Amino acid sequence: MNYRKFGNTGEKISALGFGCMRFPEYEKDGKMYVDQDKVDEMVAEAYRQGVNYFDTAPKYCNCNSEEAVGRAVKGFRDKVLLSTKIPLDVCKKPGDYRRALEHSLDKLGTDHLDFYHFWGINRKEFDQTIMAQDLLADAAKAKEEGLIRHISFSFHDEPLAIKYIIDESKKRGIPMESMLVQYNLLDRTNEEMLHYAASNGVGTVAMGPVGGGRLAAPTELYAKLTGKKSIATYELAFKFVLGNPDLNCALSGMQTLDMVKQNAKLASDSTGFSKEEWQQLGEAMEQLKKFSELYCTGCKYCQPCPAGIEIPKIFNMFTYYNVYGLKDHATP
């Protein structure tokens, strides 16, 4: 496994991070449960392969992810970096930040978090909730008490808002130490801000490195770009993300043991793109522009649909058929 300096946190982070929002689940008596045995196997294999960053959140996997992660890493908790998040909609009155933090600590079965993110924020929420309620001070107090080690944020907004959040936090004397943002071969809108964050000592993690699976189907794209033997677009996408010197970790939502092994192999590879190959990715972007008309990361936040429609699955089938021409794969 390759490791990278994680901003100014003092940590070394694995190039591959384990996103814990797509654990295998099963239904029993009308309720969804995480398959703990499979999760234990996947997490143990990831750890064995060198992955040291595990990212979860209170609402992942029908609110079962944090507990599942806590159980899975119990035997090596002190050797890995645990990351979770606080949804701002729970912060309505004084003390809510602390209550949410303590709830996550309890679910994860740990006495501290390595990274605690303000979850999915934008500039408006930063101003009207984080700053207005002085939640940075709550985070700083929790850090002083050893309940969290690093203050972080995940982000969904216009790229320039990243600079605003980093700068304003620093002005308050409570700097953001790491961030989690969307970044992949399909969506490079945050590329400039990744550089800004890295230049300011903020650790950087990319969510959606393969576009929610949209970049996983086979094509001849790599062969077209380089004249070399074709590789999966999935591998091309991963190498692109990990090839960015401003990016510390690619966070992958892994669902199977095979995915863990495949991703760990890619993140352990010492070979990457040459400067010329990197420049040629502009051509790749032209070919992939057709994705932009229907872009889905597979997060399933649109589920359940009131009409019972499996929206992510339909989008996935559409992509296989319309973009790749893989008719057999486009059959549910």
Region roles according to the model:
Residues I13, F54, K79-V80, T110-L113, ...:
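Local beta-strand N-terminus motif with an aromatic residue
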Residues L16-M21, A57, S83-K85, Y116-W119, ...:
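A cross-family glycoside hydrolase active-site/sugar-binding cleft signature
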Residues Y47, N52, R71, K170-R172, ...:
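Structured C-terminal cap/extension of enzyme domains
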Residues Y26-E27, V34, C91-A206, Y222-A223, ...:
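Glycine/proline-rich, positively charged
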